[in-house]
Amino acid sequence: MKKVVVTGGCGFIGSNLINYLLKKNYFVINVDKLSYSANIYNLKNINTSKYVFVKTDINDKKIISRILKKYKPSVIYNLAAETHVDRSIDSPEPFLHSNIYGVFNILECMRYYNNKSKNKIKLIHVSTDEVYGDILDKSKRADENYPFKPSSPYAASKASADHLIKSYIRTFNFPAIISNCSNNYGPKQFPEKLIPKLILNILNNKPLPIYGKGLNSREWIHVEDHCRALEILSIKGKIGESYNIGSGKNLSNIELTKLLMKIMKNKLSTIPKKVRINFVKDRPGHDIRYALNSKKIQKKLKWKAFIKINEGLSETVDWYINNLEYFKSISKREYENRIGLKI
């Protein structure tokens, strides 16, 4: 039985990845410090002896080393990170702590373990398309050789970690693969992010806050397609390489909002009267367009995104409608200083 560690396993992508891996008969060790956006509820249906949860920070060297020594995993999927751009603008320090120093600690714990063990642990590091920054030319999409140009403290912290891992690959022949993924959506996402915020505001008869004129364009991928890609990287990915993971489907924020309103109108029969698009002051350094060239993983590893945006959004809306009690219990943790303005 293949043993793997998933850091940040109680978060959105991490919890979806754990459920995906358990269905594939992996033994999963979930490492999560349970920050504001994490929730054990995301894994409430797990009932198997092939799952272990360890509550700790990835910066805790002793506990991370103990986990590696005890369970001897073959792969670490690193998803533990601070990810909310608005929070990074108002308070950058936690992003450096988790996204840079936390990665450094994982690298050092793995390096020490691998130097003493015959069975080496492989790192699958989950990064973001935001490291590439603005891609204003609509005829271009960033491939893996595209220069980094991060705009926010969040993006800079992720780019820093990517560079740090690449230095370990070069200097120490470190067994790591980096993935840079586009915007994820799907069930279990914390409601400070755009799609769940829009869904819940519609359900709660609230206005829909959109930055600027809503023209910022993002590439959207369903979290299930992302999880499938991460497993493929752990099996067939080439050590030392980076892989972009994207759907190729871009929508502006205003297009996404109107599509969600249309989907929800079909499900609810009508949209509540107070639900309207409310353009709010743009955030500092807001990138206009992200777009990935994912041909490398498509051609070399035979992966592609299967879930279409309309289908995926419809399924996502259903999940949120059926889990409203969960969101009532965590609503006080939302970030309401920028796009989360109380309206």
Where are the regions that the model predicts?
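Active-site helix-initiating loop/hinge in glycosyltransferases
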Residues: 186, 190, 219-222
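Intrinsically disordered, low-complexity segments enriched in polar/charged residues with Gly/Pro
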Residues: 14, 81-82, 186-187, 229-230, ...
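N-terminal Rossmann-like NAD(P)+-binding domain of SDR-like oxidoreductases, especially those catalyzing
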Residues: 1-184, 253, 288, 315, ...
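Residue-level recognition of oxygen-bearing side chains
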Residues: 63, 84, 94, 101, ...
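Proline-centered turn/helix-capping motifs that create local helix->coil transitions or kinks
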Residues: 124, 133-139, 173, 189, ...
